[in-house]
Amino acid sequence: MSARHGQSSYRDRSDEFFKIVETLRRSIAPAPAANNVPYGNNRNDGARREDLINKSEFNKRASHIGLAINQTSQKLSKLAKLAKRTSVFDDPTQEIQELTVVIKQEISALNSALVDLQLFRSSQNDEGNNSRDRDKSTHSATVVDDLKYRLMDTTKEFKDVLTMRTENMKVHESRRQLFSSNASKESTNPFVRQRPLAAKAAASESVPLPWANGSSSSSSQLVPWKPGEGESSPLLQQSQQQQQQQQQQMVPLQDTYMQGRAEALHTVESTIHELSSIFTQLATMVSQQGEIAIRIDQNMEDTLANVEGAQSQLARYLNSISSNRWLMMKIFFVLIAFLMIFLFFVA
């Protein structure tokens, strides 16, 4: 009897158990995961997973670009401090050239990365059509625009620093030419000023000897001074040779310095030209985004006008309904008739 009673009271409640488990699983883990893919729709879970991967990839690229722009700005501030030095004897040309090349390469790489990020965002916008995808597209467009403006400001600042550097180099060159021309006009060598004395000594040597004219009284006065005057000419020639050797040694140094300054100036000017092209490209991208924003603004204005028109029409219809008493009486009679039919025939 007990066995029969146990068999009659048995009931399979596996379906209820699975339903409870499914409900708890959805309430605890609403997001799709790898371990519960068999319980849900595989296609929807795959789309959500791909969406999350694309979103994380976009955020990763945007964060890397923002960090690189910040590092480039720090290097640019260091370059600005070096370029502000106006002393001829404290001119870090080598360090300025190295920083200029590094910053130019970083700005070019950032520009390429920003173009790739914009293409990646456009590919994401083409895939999504619902409201959620449109919100994400608006957010990503805002991030890209912010990065564009930051890179544009950095490029403009870099161009201003290079322009200031070019002006300082031109000022230094004009000063150097001014001092070199003054030095060539007014020589400060004391031996050069003694050239008239040497001419006098040569003239005294060309005068005929006193005893040749028969005047023996002046011979005792002129003969002792001739050796002294003759000894001054070798010293003068030696000093002139030393001066010429020093000038010949200074010529290669001046040529090397002038060549280095010319190369530095040419590098700065070519960098400014490349930055102008990058700045023009960024301005074109920003203007395109501005045109898109203008079109969106116009669409929003049209939508707002349509909503206001619909609201006015609904308010007018509401006023017409509320003022129609005959319609209210009809509705009241219909309700009374329905209630009477329900009470007499159904209940």
Curated annotation (Swiss-Prot):
The chain crosses the membrane at residues 326-346. InterPro entries: SNARE (IPR010989), Syntaxin (IPR045242), Syntaxin/epimorphin_CS (IPR006012), T_SNARE_dom (IPR000727). Residues 347 are vesicular. Signal peptide: none annotated. Residues 255-317 form the t-SNARE coiled-coil homology domain. GO terms for cellular component: Golgi apparatus; membrane. One of its GO terms (biological process) is intracellular protein transport. Keywords: Coiled coil, Golgi apparatus, Membrane, Protein transport, Transmembrane, Transmembrane helix, Transport. It is a single-pass type IV membrane protein. Residues 1-325 are cytoplasmic. It is found in: Golgi apparatus, cis-Golgi network membrane. SUPFAM superfamilies: t-snare proteins. GO terms for molecular function: SNAP receptor activity. Residues 237-249 have a biased composition (Low complexity). It comes from the Eukaryota. Residues 177-191, 213-222 have a biased composition (Polar residues). The keyword Oxidoreductase does not apply. Residues 172-191, 208-251 are annotated as: Disordered. Belongs to the syntaxin family. Vesicle trafficking protein that functions in the secretory pathway. Part of the t-SNARE complex. This is Syntaxin-32. The lineage of its organism: Eukaryota, Viridiplantae, Streptophyta, Embryophyta, Tracheophyta.
